[in-house]
Amino acid sequence: MAQYSRLEVAQVMKDTGLVPLFFNSDIEVSKKVLKACYDGGARLLEFTARGDFALEVFTALTKYAIAELPGMIMGVGSVTDAAAASLYMQMGANFIVTPVLREDIALVCNRRKVLWSPGCGSLTEIARAEELGCEIVKLFPGGIYGPDFVKAIKGPCQWTSIMPTGGVSPTKENLEGWFNAGVTCVGMGSKLIAKDNSGNYDYNKIENMTREAMQIIQDLKN
C-alpha cells in the first residue's frame, strides 16, 4: 500500500522539483543509487519497470526506503497497463508514471488515491488527463517538445502542472529553460544517474549532481 496520498506526492514534486529515474536489475546496486539520490537531497524516485524482475527489485527498494530513508517517496515508471499499476501499488508504489495516456490506469490509481502521471504529447491529451484526475502531467519525450511547447501550453492552461522527462539534464542552462517556461518539476534519468568509464554507477557523482541540480532548481523557483 502507498505511504503517501496523491496530493502529498504532488506537493513534494512541486516543492523539490526533481524526480530521478532509473532501472537496474541488481537489488544491491539499485539500493546504492537510491541512497546516493537521497543523500543528494532527492525525496522522490521513479524506478522504471523496464527489465526482468523489475517488481522484485522495486519491492526490495521500497522496503529499504521505508526502513532506512525517511521521507523518500518511491514510485514506478514505464507502466503500460492497469494490471501492472495495481501490482506495483500493492508493493508500495506511491506514484505511477506511464509513457502513454491510458484511462484504465487512471481508474485503478484514482480508486486508491495514488498519483499517476501519464505521458502526453498534445494539449488534447493533457486536457483529457486532467479530466481523468491527473495532478501532474508527464511531457514525454520532453526533448522532442522543449520549453517552448510548455510555455505555449501554460498560456491558455495556466493551471496545468507539467513534468518533462527526456531531454532534461542537470545543468543550469537546461533547467533554467524548463523552469522559466513554467514546469512544475522534471524527471531526470541517465544525465543524472551517472556511470564511470567502466560502465559502473558513480555513486559520489550521482549524489553531487543531485545536490547541485536541487540547488539550481530551488534558486530558479525562488
Name each model feature, range by range:
Residues 1-83, 87-91, 180, 200-222:
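Conserved N-terminal beta1-alpha1 strand-loop-helix module at the mouth
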Residues 18-22, 45-47, 74-77, 96-97, ...:
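Hydrophobic faces of well-ordered beta-strands that scaffold small-molecule active sites
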